[in-house]
Regions:
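Bacterial N-terminal signal peptides that target proteins for export
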Residues: 2-10
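Bacterial N-terminal signal peptides
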Residues: 12-21
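N-terminal soluble domains immediately following signal/targeting peptides that reside
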Residues: 24-403
Length: 404
């Protein structure tokens, strides 16, 4: 091949490399995106405590964490007149290292779509369990062809409460100590009476361990079954939850607001809810208002979810939320006029109470937890046997001769 052909081939290769480099650089140019911020910072947030007692917790329920989603264009400017659809999912299921609410693992915690005139969507959500939450965000324009719709997936990792590690460490030490003492007693040299297969102390210890293990297994399973039975028996009484002080539908000052959706819920499954606002005279939707939604657990009065924003073009706000605590919840929606709206009125609200059916942890999760605790006791037992044998083992005669 001549020098001229080699130069042509080299030039073609360089041209292809330049084109590919330019294309890859263009494809990596940042486009529209969504930025997530939390208040307080996520490293200061802790999962919900099932029982916020001073003995086993902080003694109070923390307010929900504020999730702020801000949409930006390719130039880093806020996207105006956008509609943001948020889906919030909990961590994936892991029966080997479960959380306080295993039924909630791998489920959809929230699904809401709201208008964002400034490109920002804010919700307040109580996060029930530790782990990595997945936020699927879809941004579309309110005005047709204002910008290209896009989707983005964000991750939010919630650390575990440090108190849980402290209490777990204390429990492990107790179980290891019990096993260690048992192994120490079993490994001791004791005379076996005629007709006995083991010394009396060993037999008593083994019998006690068997009784404790059986009692623990029976307690874990019966308590769970009783909880399931109690919840199934209480299902007909779910309608007896005291009604809310405010009605679910109200006409006031020339406006009509109605809160509708599922009448009951079940832990681990999202409930569908909707609020609509209209003018009863013209039967037209009202959109120049601000809606504020608050979901409160009634037994301990902690806020599970809150949102504030305008309705859609049909005067409606629809959302799905999961109730991860098996207790009645109150949903309150208040409406107020926007600051620059021509229609001004006094704020009013509608509300309703929703009974929530609790679900006991799966049998698999309970058995795995019992197996972990049993394994810790067995490890302590083997360690006690080993230490006892080392103490009672006679010295090596060869070692004695070498010393003498």
């Amino acid at each position: 091949m001549t020098l001229f052909k080699w130069s042509k081939l080299l030039g073609a290769i360089c041209m292809i490399a330049i084109i590919l480099y330019g294309w890859s650089g263009f494809s990596q140019t940042p486009g529209a995106s969504v930025r997530l911020t939390t208040n307080p910072p996520i490293n200061q947030v802790r999962p919900l405590e099932a029982e916020a007692t001073t003995a086993l917790g902080s003694g109070h329920y923390n307010p929900p964490v504020q999730l702020m989603l801000q949409a930006f264009d390719a130039q880093g400017q806020s996207l105006k007149n956008a509609k943001i659809h948020l889906q919030l999912f909990t961590r994936e299921k892991n029966p080997w290292f479960t959380t306080d609410f295993p039924i909630v693992e791998g489920t959809k915690l929230l699904d809401i779509e709201g208008n964002a005139p400034t490109g920002q969507l804010q919700v307040q959500q109580t996060l029930p369990i530790r782990g990595t939450y997945k936020l699927q965000v879809a941004v579309t324009p309110l005005l047709k062809n204002a910008f290209e719709p896009f989707e983005q997936t964000l991750l939010l990792t919630l650390p575990e409460n440090p108190l849980k590690f402290r209490y777990f460490g204390i429990l492990v030490v107790i179980l290891l100590t019990v096993g260690l003492l048992g192994g120490w007693v079993i490994g001791s040299r004791q005379a076996i009476q005629p007709g006995e297969i083991a010394p009396q102390r060993v037999r008593l210890l083994l019998s006690g361990l068997i009784v404790v293990a059986i009692a623990a297994l029976v307690f874990v399973n019966i308590s769970a079954e009783l909880a399931e039975s109690h919840m199934s028996m209480s299902m007909p009484g779910m309608e007896e939850v005291p009604p809310s002080a405010q009605p679910a539908q109200l006409k006031s000052q020339g406006l009509e607001m109605q809160l509708s959706g599922d009448q009951s819920a079940r832990v681990g499954q999202p409930a569908k809810l909707q609020v609509s606002l209209s003018d009863p005279k013209t039967n037209q939707p009202v959109t120049d208002v601000v809606l504020k939604v608050t979901t409160t657990q009634l037994e301990n009065n902690w806020v599970a979810f809150a949102y504030q924003g305008p309705p859609d073009s049909n005067g409606k706000l629809s959302w799905e939320q999961e109730f991860f605590d098996g207790a009645p919840h109150s949903i309150v929606v208040s409406v107020a006029p926007q600051a620059n709206a021509p229609r001004q009125f006094q704020p009013f609200q509608v509300a309703k109470n929703i009974p929530v059916e609790g679900v006991a942890p799966p049998m698999q999760v309970r058995l795995i937890s019992l197996a972990y605790f049993t394994a810790i006791v067995v490890i302590g037992l083997l360690l006690g046997l080993w230490l006892r044998q080392r103490q009672t083992q006679p010295p090596d005669l060869t070692w004695k001769r070498s010393v003498s």
